[in-house]
Amino acid sequence: MNQIKSNRELYLQYSASAPKLLAHVSKLLIFCRNSGISIPKGIRNIFEFTWEELINDPAVPTASEIQDLVVTFGTPTVVLAEVIPVQVLPMQKKQPPPAPPPTLMPAATSGGKYVPPTSTSAKLMPNGQNTLHKFQRQSIHLLTELLSLKMKAMVESASAGANPLDITKRFVEASQLLHLNAKEMAFDCLTGTVGKSCLSTAQLGKESSMNISAMGVNTPYQLVYQTSTACLSFSLCTGKESRKKDIGAKPKPVDDVSPQPVRARTPPENTVVELPDPCPEAREKLQDMCRHIEAERILWRGRNASCPMIFRNYRSRISSHLMLASKGDSHHPLTTGTQITASAPHQPSSQHAQMGRHSQEWKGPKKPIKLHYTFYDGSSFIYYPSGNIALLQIPTCCRGKPITCLFNDMPNTFLALFNAEGLGCVYYNLKNCCPYVLVLDEEGGITNDQKGYIVHRWSWASKTETLLSLEYKVNEQMKLTVLGQDSITVTFTSMNETVTISVSPKSCPHNVLHDKRPVRRISLMDEKVSKTNRALAEIKKRFQKTVTQFMNSVLLAAGLFTLEYPNPKETETSRVKLKPGSNQDRIRKTSLYQGENHMRIQSARQDSIINETLKEDSILTSLAHVQKKNGKVQVKVLPRGKRREVRSPTRWAASPSDCPLVLRRLILKEDIRAGCKCIVKAPLVSDLELERFLSAPRDPNQVLVFGIMSSQDPTLTAQLQWLMDTLYSHLQQGRSSPCIQCRHDPYRLLRYDLDSPLQKDPPLMVKKFAVIHGMVLMFAGGKLLFGGCVLNGYGFSKQNLLKQIFRAQQDCKMGYFLPDNYKFKHDAFKASRIAKPCGLSSRGVPSQFLGLETEPSMSTYVTNLDDTESTKKPPSDDYEGSVSSVALVDKIEKEPPPSPEKVKPPEIELQPFTKMRRSSKKTAGFKKLNSKK
């Protein structure tokens, strides 16, 4: 309590010495003007200093490596800890009383700009100075009484616990206790001096009329209480001041002007208001505005929002300085221009330029430029002179918890952010590697340089070394000042206007208290624990997914789990109504027979030297560094789980067309709830759903591999059946619904049975492509890519089948497809000699090699375009010999022997064939079978 009382006494002492200081400053200004010394307009009034700025002893700043940053560290003092939190808030409420002093001098010297420059104005300097000095003495006396009344009202309100907003109203009531004798004394002193100066010389009528209009007041002051801003203002002017328009006309006699103030002071004080109103229309409009503002204030008070509204524009103080300069220098026109150009003293001075600039600044902008606007809800806005927002402060839950944003003087440029919890960050206003220059939190703060290195670090709770002060120039107009965790301010200065906003963390009853806020403390151990928890969560998801897939596979194999498919009616309407010729619309450009055959022959010769020691199972994962004679070619086949899938822009959902069995049941209007059961063997495709299955939407780069089977004689296609089953089981391992889950695989394995009861007579494959048992067909996008009995130029094996699928994929990407009317021609080997005792003869060639011809070129397989003779021949003649090799040999023996010119030795004829088949493990078995036959 002793500290608080001493502060009040100190404040009373400052208030008592303020009028003397103001008088001294006024004399100094008069002396500077008379001497022709230009004074800047940005002199700060002593009453604008806050209590914190007056009592704090600024520490010595330390040099910082960051530009525009001044940081001071040291041991925290007791004054900062005890005095600032207690005295900052009460003293901020005591700032309104000193507001009137800045208006004394402009109001007292108003009207000076209307004096035309004359040569005789210099003679009035002594009289004008005496008048000004007497007026200042009376103003100081008035200011002293006002300050004493203000302090008395504040002490009474503080002791009684009244609302601080009612202090100003009490001040108005207390001001009425002033003696009327003091007012009359000031009036007599002022008017007496003016009268003497006016009657002394008859040639100075204009000057006397001007002085009378300014000094002829009925009372020394008139207090006006503004309810919108809760502020007081007083003026030393009367209603006669509105008649300044008559100054330029004829000067009125002194006798007509001087008696009016005398008549105004003789009646009682209550009759002064009865003077004629100079502008009733304007007064009515102002009264309407005041009533509207008061109604809004009452409305917001009901909403628990009692923040006063502030509408502050630029040049509000500049115009008052201009009024002061013009009035004080009415007798010296040359110094007027000097005062106007005080903000730019290095500019050349000229009378005409100065007077022109004076007139322009006096008129001011037609539309006021916004500076600082504050509304009832607590939101505050500060603007640049250009109109862009510099500072934005919006309350969250109440006025005490705002969010503050700082912006640069250009659109969409963010500088800083502060919230009510004490978190904040300040960005560099230029492009740097590290965007943050300052970061604040509950524990402390750090400052970073442009490269991101930490320059300073401090803690609010430190007892030995803490932050004493920090100043950072955010840009040319804004400066951030940090004196503690509870004292963070942003100062905006532009065009001699200064606005200070507090961004300190505050507490409110709607949220957690400031001292109970959770502190963010994340150590290295916590980071490790969080990483471990994330890894465990990922492992848990994988395990659950694997177990779910395994259970679905078991249930699906047991018939206890079925897949849900779309409504059969909707699927039937969208799929069954396809036109028969829709497959022809998907045809791309076809390749010529010569180019296709030449490419396949060359690829077969290059791959003939591939190392056969590679394991067959490793082909599914990768084929790398394949050696050739002239160089190394790297062939990479990624694993099934990591294949680079080339998908079309549209992704297909699960549909019945993915599984041939489900599609067949859908066409037959059977129940499809059983779902897909193609887990062990490749799905069997019949003629009933073949066209629709090929034309169904799927990945255009997916290769459909059809194996032509025979159910009546399984021994003819036993090797192909075993190869398809082995590869299919390895490909679909672990899948609960293979037909749906293989939509994005590079290839699919399918079966086509020529002897199935669901096939037509003849089957579609035989009718369209003239296929036989044991052949392999490959489709992509509904078009044929490959067909034959010999894979990759050698025969049937898993390695050769995968290589042939890879070639088909490359052909599909290049757009090489076989024509739609393409039919395969199957001729037996032409041999002229009888088989040798070893058993190797043309009759012993198995049915899998029925695509070969014994020409000198020894091509892998021969494909001819369908001619007119082949189309007339019935399809039964084409594949009748492929069913049994014995029937084929009998057919060959009945043919006439060839001519001697075409007959070749068997050594020359069979040498390339034996060389090519040397690496095949299946040749020995065929030789033994032929020898037995």
From Swiss-Prot:
Membrane topology: Single-pass membrane protein
Transmembrane segments: 771-791
Region feature (Disordered): 244-277, 343-364, 890-933
Keyword Membrane: yes
Keywords: Membrane, Transmembrane, Transmembrane helix
Basic residues bias spans: 915-933
Species in which this protein is naturally found: Mus musculus
Pfam families, alphabetized: FAM194
Ranges annotated as biased composition (Polar residues): 343-353
Cell compartments where the protein resides: Membrane
Disulphide-bonded residues: none
Any Gene Ontology CC annotation: cytoplasm
Designated name of the protein: Uncharacterized protein C3orf20 homolog
Alphabetized InterPro entries for the sequence: FAM194_C
Record's compositionally biased regions (Basic and acidic residues): 244-255, 890-907
PANTHER family the UniProt entry points to: SIMILAR TO CHROMOSOME 3 OPEN READING FRAME 20
